Design a protein with these regions (language model features):
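A beta-strand edge to alpha-helix "cap/lid" segment located at domain peripheries
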Residues: 1-4, 58-132
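Alpha-helical structural motif
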Residues: 5-8, 20, 53, 57, ...
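A solvent-exposed, acidic/Ser-Thr-rich amphipathic alpha-helical stretch
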Residues: 22-25, 29-80
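Short, mixed-charge, low-aromatic patches
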Residues: 9-18, 41-44, 60-62, 85
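Hydrophobic pocket/interface hotspot
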Residues: 9-12, 24-25, 32, 49, ...
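Short, low-complexity N-terminal intrinsically disordered segments enriched in polar/charged residues
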Residues: 1-31, 128-132
Length: 132
């Protein structure tokens, strides 16, 4: 199942980077638990359910950024847990460029993401979200 999890999440990052949010949400359990660290005007706290992630997290991105990608460098397969290490690359509405390294920790069950934690480089993340 873990190879399937890596493939699923690789496809999910590709969908996110082309702004195909319906395809991203297909990889999530409807009751996914989601955590964002905040910083600047970035979403912060715990979100419950795919609909909340779409409405309260993803929908804020185009309000602040003209470009925004989560580019994975590698995937660490831990069976039901998957760690994705990479960097956010973005350009704010004000033209500020952001690059912030991340480690995303996913928990998977039956081929769907059931939880997500965004561990991100704090200073550039907060600065990027404040520069819109």
């Amino acid at each position: 199942m873990s190879e399937q999890n890596v493939s699923t999440m690789r496809n999910t990052y590709e969908a996110f980077n082309r702004a195909d949010i319906p395809a991203v949400l297909e990889a999530f359990d409807p009751q996914i638990e989601w955590h964002e660290p905040g910083g600047g005007s970035a979403p912060q706290g715990d979100y419950h359910g795919a609909e909340s992630v779409a409405n309260d997290v993803f929908s804020t991105i185009p309000e602040h950024f003209d470009e925004f990608e989560a580019r994975p460098d590698f995937f660490i397969d831990g069976s039901e847990h998957l760690v994705v290490v990479g960097a956010f690359h973005a350009r704010s509405k004000a033209g500020h460029r952001m690059q912030a390294r991340y480690a995303h920790v996913w928990k998977m069950r039956d081929g769907k993401a059931i939880s997500f934690n965004n561990h991100v480089e704090a200073a550039p993340w907060a600065e990027g979200w404040s520069a819109s």
